[in-house]
Amino acid sequence: IFKNGTIIDPKSSYIGKKRLPLLLLDTEMVKTDRTMFSARGAGIIGFSTFGRNTKYALDKDMQIDFGLVEEFCEKHRNETVLMFGYTYMIWQYVIRALEEKGKTFPFSKVIVFHIGGWKKLKDQAVSTLEYNKRLSQVFGGGVEVHNYYGMAEQLGSVFVECEYGHM
């Protein structure tokens, strides 16, 4: 309960107390296939408590389920939408995949929380500024991005990056 309380307090100042429509930028397999269950799965399950009408953007083959995301986008077009995923996976399987297809999802307001995977992106020379810019381009202009640290290394102790880029 304490760890769950630790997760709730920092995020409520960013997303409010109301549960938002949640699009998980991952595959549901991470939750249903126990061989894939890890800190990643625990993070997804923990973060899911902040959402409602939760959907997974990626199919079992880590491809964007365009029909599902388009339907989610249409259903929640005039609402603030919450998204969560792992930094590298969002880059690889969402941002780059959408760019390659020349596709965007025009949400009116999106709050994205992402965690982990910066070491993998370092090899690709992706800065925080570039990451946030391209994330905003594929999900529309009203994107608020929050990078945070702590789920893998210290499950339950969460540190959200401030507006100046400090944790």
Give the location of each predicted region.
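Conserved AMP-binding
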Residues: 28
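Active-site glycine/GP-rich loop and adjacent strand/helix microenvironment
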Residues: 16-25, 33-167
